[in-house]
Amino acid sequence: MRFKFLSAALLVLFSVWVIYSFMFWGRPVPFQIQTVERIDGNGDGVIDTWRLDSSQDGQADITELDTDGDGRIDRLQVSHPNVEVIDVSGREPRLARRKLAVCLDGVPYEDMAALWDQGYFREFARPAKLISSFPSLSDVALTELLHTGKVPGYENLYFDTQSNQIAGGATSTVSKVRMPYLDVLDYDEPGIFKGLAYLIPIRIYHADLGRFRKRYAASRLPAYVSHICSTDSVCHVLNREQFLKLMVEVDRLLREIYIQHRGQIDLVVFSDHGNSHVQNRRIDLDGFLAQNGFRMEPAIRSENSVVVPAFGLVGALPVYSQPQNTPKLARLLASHEATDFAVYLEGQQIQICSSRGSAVIEAKGSGGSLKYAAVDGDPLQLKSVLQRMLEQKQLDADGFASTESWFAATAPHEYADAVNAIYQGVTNHVTNRANVFVSLKDGYHYGSPFFDWLVTMRSTHGNLRRTSMTGFFMRNSPMQAAVLPARELLRDFFEEKVH
């Protein structure tokens, strides 16, 4: 009897602890620094002074100033224990300083630029555009950003072509098995929470920020790389106004880190891709394929088998089947109302199919020069771009141009960096390459039926459209480039991290 009573008491205590922990877990981060007021010091209608309270007594003891009117804080005045004025302009060369790279997963350029224009994130220069990889999915994008080895698939759940089965899933982010980019990250949200982000997105987001803050504070690494995954989750399920409101908490978090270092830190903050901010619905791919003589299966069992891993609710999908089906499948999938275009590799050419026509991309040498040629129509809407490149003598006699020229010509296009991105997307990034890759129109997604039942998707990414392909980057020092390919952002950072 006594044992039963003790067991019951322990069970009650454990239940109370679980409930208590859950109630207080995932609450907003208790920031130490509060903004007291924002001031237009010179009366030109633009905020240039931020007065902060770090002692939680309601009195300002830190002042951030933008003295040259460029929008970025360049002077820091600290009033405790003594008054000290610190030059944080970043214009003069400094001795080696600690470096911090923060990836805010899935934050669109337009959103970060809007927040900066409202007076947030002013420790940084105005955000610039960072063009992602194709597909604009995190595993692929982070592989390119962090310059690591190939991941097995386009998402955590992928098709293993050697074993002819679906592999990975949520366990791959927990175990880090065959996910090279995870080994480079000094902080990443534990994999177990990534699926829960659809259920309790705001709690997961708060917990992610708090966990990163704690881990970074405890680290002594001279160069620290972090990935805040939950920003993407909340962008998927909240409307834009709600999302922007939550992003203000990141502003406070980064300001706190900046002040703790008295501005003497090299910060680069960026996103791996953008987001559409368009409510979208899942396509019935299984039914569509069945109507046209194919069968969706978890393995390639016959000439009619098609495998498409269904995981995140995203705007792009890899398609696997018997090689002889590839051209037929590409044309079929391109005819679906939700498809923007489909691509596949045929010999040395990348074939592009869409309702707007077809085209090919060819590479010269090792891929340093590329050619886009419309076969019929203009599937990527590049006719005017090609004409301009021809007039500017950027194309050689055979129609090839350097990857740098293609980037400069197409980075602001609706299909951002289209020629480079498609070439790399079809030939690189993953070890289990798809037979066909489909880019969906905004407003559609494909993925887990369970996740689709669970949430209303107010935004997604994955396709080649500008909103999904355009992330942002910003530094707490002067910036030269207004737009940059993601692969170029962290080259110097990692050279210094290694050395």
Mark where each language-model region is.
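Metal-dependent active-site segment of extracytoplasmic phospho-/sulfohydrolases and closely related
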Residues: 101, 253-285
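Short secondary-structure boundary/capping segments
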Residues: 93-94, 115-120, 239-244, 280-290, ...
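Acidic, His- and aromatic-enriched active-site or binding-groove loops in soluble protein domains
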Residues: 89, 152-159, 245-255, 285-302
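His/Asp/Glu-rich, glycine-adjacent segments
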Residues: 116-120, 133-249, 363, 368-415, ...
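Active-site neighborhoods of enzymes that stabilize oxyanions during catalysis
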Residues: 306-490
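Calcium-binding acidic motifs and repeat modules
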Residues: 7-98, 438
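Active-site metal-binding loops of divalent metal-dependent hydrolases
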Residues: 106, 271-274, 442
